[in-house]
Amino acid sequence: MHRFKNILLLHDTSPEHELVLKRAVDLARRNRARLTVVDVIEENSWDSGEIYGSQPFRDLKQFVIKERQEELETAIEPVRQQGLDVRAKLLFGKPFLEIIRQVLRENHDLVIKAAQGEGGLQGMLFGSTAMHLMRKCPCPVWVVKTGGSERYSRIIAALDPDPSDGQRNKLSAKIMDLATSLAKQDQSQLLVVHTWSLYGETIL
């Protein structure tokens, strides 16, 4: 059974990203899926203030775009040589918003990104982009922990089923499918988590 047909991977330049790319390629190959690797340039750093509209800064912006595009192409060239259907795409804007827009435009059925902590208890594993995607992305999001073994001893699947919401149940089923498949592949322990709010708890 091929669970995923159109996978989206968020690229980054960290040394650990090679492991994340390998995971994405392995999954795409097993599912005979198309893989799209994207990088996102945040435009707000370029478009605020009069000075950023000057010719030198426009030239610098074009240089950065060219560099990022070349980095992206270099990263996926070995994958193309293996015969996998893989594309590169550069997006502009706020990362989590552009990823969600890309998912909606191209009907991606899975998003993969590296875990990037940003300090604090919550930031030990998930950065703000991952948290936004897990809350708002309309397809499953696989956040890959880097820096350890290539095989995982524990996998967590966060589900949010709702008897009155068919779309939410469908998304939870897809997440469970992916988590089960990965746990079998790595012979991992699978943990399924769900949180809920008690109606009226704010007035207790």
Task: Annotate each language-model stretch with its function.
Residues M1-R3, E16, R23-D26, K66, ...:
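Structural beta-alpha unit
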Residues S45, F96-E98, G120, E150-R151, ...:
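Generic structural signal for helix capping and beta-alpha/helix-loop junctions
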Residues T129, C137-P138:
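Short, structured coil segments at secondary-structure junctions
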Residues K113-A115, V141-T146:
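Short beta-strand elements of ligand-binding domains
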Residues L110-H132:
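Glycine-rich, Arg-bearing micro-motifs that act as flexible, cationic patches
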Residues P56-E70:
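A short acidic, glycine-rich active-site loop
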